[in-house]
UniProtKB/Swiss-Prot annotation:
<keyword id="KW-0808">Transferase</keyword>
<keyword id="KW-0696">RNA-directed RNA polymerase</keyword>
<keyword id="KW-0548">Nucleotidyltransferase</keyword>
<comment type="similarity">
    <text>Belongs to the reoviridae RNA-directed RNA polymerase family.</text>
</comment>
<dbReference type="GO" id="GO:0044423">
    <property type="term" value="C:virion component"/>
</dbReference>
<dbReference type="InterPro" id="IPR007097">
    <property type="entry name" value="RNA-dir_pol_reovirus"/>
</dbReference>
<protein>
    <recommendedName>
        <fullName>RNA-directed RNA polymerase</fullName>
        <ecNumber>2.7.7.48</ecNumber>
    </recommendedName>
</protein>
<dbReference type="InterPro" id="IPR001795">
    <property type="entry name" value="RNA-dir_pol_luteovirus"/>
</dbReference>
<keyword id="KW-0694">RNA-binding</keyword>
<dbReference type="GO" id="GO:0019079">
    <property type="term" value="P:viral genome replication"/>
</dbReference>
<keyword id="KW-0547">Nucleotide-binding</keyword>
<dbReference type="GO" id="GO:0000166">
    <property type="term" value="F:nucleotide binding"/>
</dbReference>
<dbReference type="GO" id="GO:0003968">
    <property type="term" value="F:RNA-directed RNA polymerase activity"/>
</dbReference>
<keyword id="KW-0946">Virion</keyword>
<dbReference type="InterPro" id="IPR043502">
    <property type="entry name" value="DNA/RNA_pol_sf"/>
</dbReference>
<dbReference type="GO" id="GO:0006351">
    <property type="term" value="P:DNA-templated transcription"/>
</dbReference>
<dbReference type="Pfam" id="PF02123">
    <property type="entry name" value="RdRP_4"/>
</dbReference>
Length: 1167
């Protein structure tokens, strides 16, 4: 075991957070608050105050002293937190300006901007200006980076003044705020800190780019920028802004984007000068730079010829593996001509990414491609583009419809779509009757999210009237007052309110906010269709069939095709899919007539059709389709003087439950129609594989025709259906669902923007938990392409500003890294290397383990707000839950007491979705944690449960360790992390979802799930089993009956003696969830028994269930160990005698019975 690594990490982290503190405050005083052991408990006391430098020297002296490593770790673990006293409250913004000046001076002493960089920046600036002039008619005033005062002068209507001069409103100007979880000056200071500690490692090119970016940051910082303060007020009043002649519209965004480019400067491999070009272009065309600079990738992926290997895959989607043979290269003249023509017309000729692309078409090495690909990912980090909702939605739904279409093709499309839907709906109605006795109320309402219902109305909440838009509260209001909520059609005809979504490099998109009735009606239909698609129905055409455990390798078939180059791969992109003509009348009438036809097919009568709250699901579905065919969209821009807009719309509504799966069906029907018509003129085409995902599609085919002929013909066929498409064809590369598959390798872009966000962060979460999710996103970017140096840099930027908690105006607590990297309201819930959950302790001493458990658990606080309990006893809540309970009882044909209690608990938790309730919960938790910290002398009881790493250490102490042989292997699924690669080389890559040892079968859970309309989790079973006396037959019988199990099933289950086995499995079900192994690059590891046995060989007489649980615990701990230390091993544990064996087995079983697993906010099911 490697305590040295842990010691080095812990000391470095404490020192880093301290030196950052001394950088951003003037003369702070710091004092250690230490833990003292007092047999039963620990108590804390504060030591004398020092300067941060003195404290850093003290920590340094501990690390360099001659005591043992374990004692050094103990000395550092005893630091519970460090109090920081700040007397001089001078403005941090002035300090940041001094730091900026100092940093720029320091870089200038080392280098100056070369002609090469200067030319690159000037050239792209001129090209961006020209592009702006040529495309000016499509620009809105807020797309120009102009003075805010000029914008206000000509666009008064974009603003609403408030009573408080700092509380004015403007949708448009608010869209220009970057939304980060710290103030802009704090971001700059942490970027300066992270670069300063690496200063000696930069090469000349990196220094030049740093100089350029820091100068841009300084210019915008000195000129001033508009920001929204934490108290939700603006930094400037309108009067100030009208007078100010230096604040530009995009200043804050340019600062944040420049900071992002400084972070990507640490990616390996990358073209440094291109990052400067991104900012130069972004300063000129802020709303369009990302899209324009990234666009050549779509074409390049189809023509670049990588040096790679042939990939073979079986017809099982998930199986694919690279062979030794080199891949086959294939590029036709017509493809090169198309590329050259496009590139000659490309407006940004000086883009260094495009220059690299032009040089690298044939025989490209993976490293060069990675550099180009990372440049492409970098363009998205300038942040989210936010347009005014009215302008964006108007552009989104504008489509010219025509009657001049190919009638025959339209008929084919309509009949195909109708036939597919008819078969599905007939099955759906029968399944609901046999499974739930036709009442699907409980399932539909249980799945309903507490999102907006589109408009605000007054409802009673506990003891007060509140105005709210929440679906749940509207539903409760309707039910408790017995209002008529069944004429959905009329409601939709009044108009559909619109929301928006923002993404980097794309225009703002509108989202339809439909009423709760639509969600309730469509839920079971959508679920049924998804389930069918997931099981690989419809010839495994739907991407949903590929999202199960091995999502990572489902693109195996496509990887194989691109490596052999024997099939033509066609990916078509329909622009404005939702509003296209085939999605208007044909799509809606296919749904309506499919329902009518399905009714003639099934064996149940009208009264047995599924119902929700007394409404017939199929009747209402027809009503919804009819209403949506010709709907009015209401688009408001509330933070402006713009009048609400009403727009006539006929397309698909993104906001229905059935949108995505409905799109996939329509897409299959559309492609099939196009190809049926194509084979008349091109009989040599043989379609091999088809995959759709919403409006995305890919088809692979064998053909004797030329590639450009096929492309032209396809476009022409789509045109005859009035669908505007880009049809891209290639033999060796394609893009689907944001993944790029080229010559047998799969790349994912690291395009998660960290320093900007789509919406402002809620005030209800602590800075620590938002920072945790940012570290997680940074880790995903690093694993996908930017590499380990980028992740280290990002933790240095993200952690120090979030490492301290404000206690009073002058006092802050700088938390111990151990507390920060654990779970709870003041923790990141993530490890420094990007795995979700708690940082592990790599130390073998028992005393250190005790200290460590205290530091990780004393702040894990959870509070249930009173309002949840109060609301659950109101008539409004009762109205909803009573309807749901009676629906469960009809569906299960029994009382099902436990199921109905679980239902009530789950519905109670939804009250958290009400504004203020969640905020109250999180604020109370944070306050309690702060109080816990501020008590000077506090007694902390010791933790008696075992942490999983204690089992890991126990096995290691009793094993012989050897260095494993790592297999070198060719990657299909690309990642850029040394340690993930090591893990893959030792335990392999998940190549199939086939022969792994499955999660042991929990028969009890299966029986309950079979009948229960609501989702039941294993922990629910454990909780309720404690309320029954399971030692005698009657207790067991009552428990099972209350779960809704009866008749023969009950008899057989009782006789099978499986109850205790299943309850044990339920207890450890959490082990089958890997906390936050969400980066797909980690999901490519086969986290199962076979993999565990490659690392651990354990010959102990353990019962089978315990053996599996032990192996899983060891495997997760091993993944954490390798990701942290970068070392691998193989462990063999064979006890020398029977006595030792018996003793070990007893200890292990006790530990597993008393294990304490992380409770985390996010986790992934990996089985």
């Amino acid at each position: 075991m490697e305590p040295e690594n842990y010691l080095a990490w812990l000391a470095r982290d404490i020192v880093r957070n301290l030196s950052y503190t001394s950088l951003v405050y003037n003369n702070p005083k710091v004092a250690i608050v230490e833990l003292l052991d007092n047999k039963e408990a620990f108590f804390t006391y504060e030591k004398e105050q020092k300067t941060p430098e003195a404290l850093i020297n003290y920590i340094d002296s501990i690390v360099k002293s001659s005591i043992s490593v374990e004692d050094k770790i103990e000395a550092l673990l005893k630091i519970r937190y460090i109090s920081v006293y700040v007397d001089d409250k001078s403005d941090k913004r002035d300090i940041v300006l001094q730091l900026l000046n100092r940093t720029i001076k320091k870089i200038e002493s080392k280098t100056k901007i070369s002609n090469e960089l200067n030319d690159a920046i000037n050239a792209i600036t001129i090209e961006s200006r020209n592009w702006k002039i040529q495309n000016s008619e499509s620009f809105k005033p807020y797309h120009y980076n102009q003075l805010v005062s000029d914008f206000l002068k000509y666009n008064e209507f974009e603003i609403l003044e408030g009573t408080d001069p700092l509380k004015w409103k403007s949708d448009t100007l608010q869209g220009l705020s970057p939304n980060y979880n710290h103030r802009t000056h704090t971001l700059i200071s942490s970027i300066i800190y992270a670069t300063s500690v690496r200063f000696d490692n930069y090469n000349d090119e990196q220094l030049q780019v740093l100089l350029y970016l820091f100068s841009i940051i300084k210019t915008n910082y000195v000129n001033g920028y508009l920001e929204i303060l934490p108290n939700r007020k603006w930094s400037h009043s309108l009067a100030d802004l009208r007078e100010n002649k230096s604040i530009m519209m995009y200043s804050a965004k340019i600062i944040h984007a420049s900071c992002a480019m400084i972070s990507i400067l640490h990616a390996v491999p990358i073209d440094y000068f291109f990052l400067a070009q991104i900012i130069a272009s972004f300063s000129e065309i802020p709303a369009h730079a990302a899209k324009q600079l990234s666009s050549p990738m779509t074409l390049y992926i189809g023509i670049a010829q990588l040096r790679s290997n042939i990939v073979v895959s079986t017809k099982i989607a998930a199986e694919s593996v690279a062979t030794e043979s080199p891949n086959i290269s294939r590029l036709e003249e017509s493809q090169l001509r198309e590329w050259e023509q496009e590139m000659n017309e490309y407006p940004f000729q000086s883009s260094r990414m495009v220059r690299m692309m032009k040089k690298n078409i044939f025989d490209v090495s993976v490293d060069v491609f990675y550099a180009i690909f990372n440049c492409f990912s970098a363009t998205f980090h300038v942040g989210h583009r936010i347009d005014n909702p009215q302008d964006a939605i108007e552009a989104q739904v504008k489509v010219e419809y025509t009657s001049d279409v190919d009638k025959e093709m339209y008929d084919q499309y309509y009949f195909l779509l109708k036939r597919m839907l008819t078969d599905q709906l007939a099955e759906y109605a029968e399944e609901m009757y046999f499974k739930y006795n036709s009442d699907v109320t409980a399932e539909s309402l249980a799945a309903m999210a507490n999102s907006s219902n589109g408009y605000s109305r007054s409802v009673t909440f506990i003891d007060r009237e509140i105005k709210t838009t929440k679906k749940m509260l509207h539903l409760d209001d309707d039910l408790s007052k017995n209002l008529n909520f069944t004429n959905i059609g009329e409601q939709i005809k009044k108009g559909i309110p619109m929301g928006t979504r923002n993404v980097p490099a794309r225009q703002t998109r509108g989202i339809f906010i439909l009423s709760w009735q639509v969600a309730a009606i469509q839920h079971t239909i959508a679920e049924f269709l998804y389930k069918k698609a997931k099981k690989g129905g419809f010839g495994a055409t739907f991407a949903e069939a590929y999202v199960s455990k091995a999502a990572t390798l489902t693109y195996g078939i496509l990887a194989e095709a691109t490596s052999k180059a024997d099939q033509l791969i066609l990916y078509t992109d329909v622009s404005q899919w939702d509003a296209s003509q085939h999605n208007t009348e044909p799509y809606r009438s296919a749904w309506i007539n499919a329902i009518k036809e399905a009714r003639t097919k099934y064996k149940i009568n009208y009264n047995q059709e599924p119902v929700v709250l007394g409404m017939n699901v199929l009747d209402k579905m027809i009503e919804i389709q009819e209403a949506l065919l010709n709907s009015n969209l209401i688009v408001e821009s509330q933070g402006s003087k713009r009048q609400p807009l009403r727009i006539k719309y006929h397309g698909v509504a993104s906001g229905e439950k059935t949108t995505k799966i409905g799109n996939s069906f329509a897409n299959v029907a559309l492609i099939t129609t196009v190809f049926n018509n194509l084979t008349n003129t091109m009989p040599s085409i043989r379609v091999n594989h088809m995959r759709v995902d919403g409006d995305d599609n890919v088809v692979t085919m064998y053909t004797a025709n030329r590639i450009d002929e096929v492309q032209e013909n396809i476009k022409e066929k789509y045109k005859r259906m009035n669908a505007k498409v880009k049809a891209l064809a290639s033999y060796t590369g394609l893009e689907m669902a944001k993944r790029f598959i080229i010559c047998g390798k799969i790349f994912e872009r690291g395009a998660i923007s960290i320093f900007t966000a789509e919406r402002p962060y809620g005030t209800d979460l602590s800075v620590q938990s938002t920072t945790g999710s940012l570290i997680y996103s940074a880790a995903v970017n690093a694993y996908r392409g930017f590499g380990d140096d980028y992740l280290n840099f990002m933790t240095d930027v993200l952690v120090p500003p979030s490492a301290s908690v404000k206690i009073t105006g002058r006092l802050r607590s700088l938390l111990s890294p151990v507390t920060l990297y654990s779970t709870g309201p003041l923790s990141f819930e993530i490890t420094p290397y990007g795995l979700g959950g708690r940082m592990r302790l790599f130390s073998l001493s028992k005393e250190n383990m005790e200290l460590y458990k205290i530091l990780t658990s004393s702040l894990a606080i959870s509070i249930q707000p009173d309002e949840i309990k109060k609301y659950s006893s109101t008539p409004q809540f009762k109205a909803r839950v009573d309807r749901m309970i009676s629906s469960v009882q009809i569906a299960m044909k029994s009382e099902a007491k436990i199921i109905t209690s679980i239902l009530r608990d789950k519905e109670e938790q939804k009250t958290l979705g009400v504004p203020n309730v969640a905020t109250a919960k999180n604020r109370q938790q944070i306050d309690k944690a702060r109080k816990t910290l501020s008590l000077p002398k506090e007694i902390l009881p010791k933790v008696t449960k075992y942490y999983p790493e204690e089992i890991f250490h126990l096995i290691l102490r009793n094993s012989t360790l050897t260095i494993p042989k790592l297999n070198t292997m060719t990657k299909v699924y690309m990642n850029n992390s040394v340690n993930i690669t090591k893990l893959q080389q030792q335990i392999g890559v998940r190549v199939s979802s086939g022969i792994q040892v499955h999660k042991p079968i929990n028969t009890l859970l299966k029986l309950v799930e079979k009948h229960s309309p609501i989702k039941i989790s294993p922990s629910d079973l454990i909780l309720y089993s404690k309320k029954y006396d399971l030692t005698n037959l009657n207790g067991k019988k009552q428990f099972l009956m209350d779960l809704g199990i009866s008749g023969n099933e009950l008899r057989f289950y009782l006789n099978s003696k499986l109850l205790f086995h299943d309850l044990l499995l339920s207890k450890y079900d959490k082990l089958y969830e890997a906390p936050g192994f969400g980066a797909t690059q980690l999901n490519a590891l086969p986290l199962d028994l076979t993999a565990a046995e490659k690392v651990f060989s354990i010959k102990l007489n353990l019962p089978n269930t315990y053996y599996e649980l032990l192996m899983l615990v060891l495997l997760y701990e091993y993944v954490n160990f390798v990701m942290f230390t970068g070392n691998t091993f193989r462990a063999v544990c064979i006890p020398e005698s029977q006595t030792i064996n018996a003793k070990l087995v007893k200890t292990i079983m006790t530990m597993i019975d008393n294990i304490q697993l992380d409770t985390v906010m996010f986790s992934d099911n990996i089985f």
